[in-house]
């Protein structure tokens, strides 16, 4: 219940070689499209390399900056989770935040989530926003 309104859909569109992560928040749809070209611009994470090319801390910073530009109160959101997701031979970070806590009148705290996608070159993916 604390993460209501978050819908994540990951779809691989093979004809276009594109992966899309979708978040719905506050009546809007945010589609994070990642093309094969986007992935190729950044470093791969070879199986023989212990750590990813981009640190989790740098991915979090990039995601925080992107969230602050996307949402009016984005700078106030709390970090919830950082996930590594493989896409073919490359990886991306999925950085999830929870909005600032708000009461529902009954003393219970409700919070929605929002996820930002970060490439291994440190670039946060800018979403397409639609109503």
Language-model segments: which ranges?
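Sec-dependent signal peptide recognition
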Residues: 1-9
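Compositionally biased P/S/T/G-rich terminal and signal peptide-adjacent segments
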Residues: 16-44
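Exposed beta-strand-loop-beta-strand "reactive/processing" segments of non-cytosolic proteins
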Residues: 18-21, 76-131
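Short, non-transmembrane alpha-helical segments in secretory-pathway proteins
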Residues: 45-82
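Boundary at the C-terminal end of the N-terminal hydrophobic targeting segment
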Residues: 8, 14-15
């Amino acid at each position: 219940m604390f993460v209501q309104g978050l819908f994540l859909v990951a779809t691989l569109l093979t004809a276009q070689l594109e992966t899309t992560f979708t978040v719905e928040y506050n009546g809007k749809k945010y589609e994070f499209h990642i093309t094969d070209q986007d992935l190729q611009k950044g470093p791969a994470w070879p199986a023989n390399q212990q750590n990813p090319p981009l640190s989790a801390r740098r991915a979090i910073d990039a995601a925080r900056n992107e969230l602050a530009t996307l949402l009016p109160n984005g700078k106030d959101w709390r970090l919830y989770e950082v996930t590594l997701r493989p896409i073919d031979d490359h990886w991306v970070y999925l950085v999830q935040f929870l909005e600032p806590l708000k009461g529902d009148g009954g003393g219970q705290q409700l919070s929605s989530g929002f996820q930002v996608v970060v490439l291994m070159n440190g670039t946060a993916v800018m979403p397409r926003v639609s109503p």
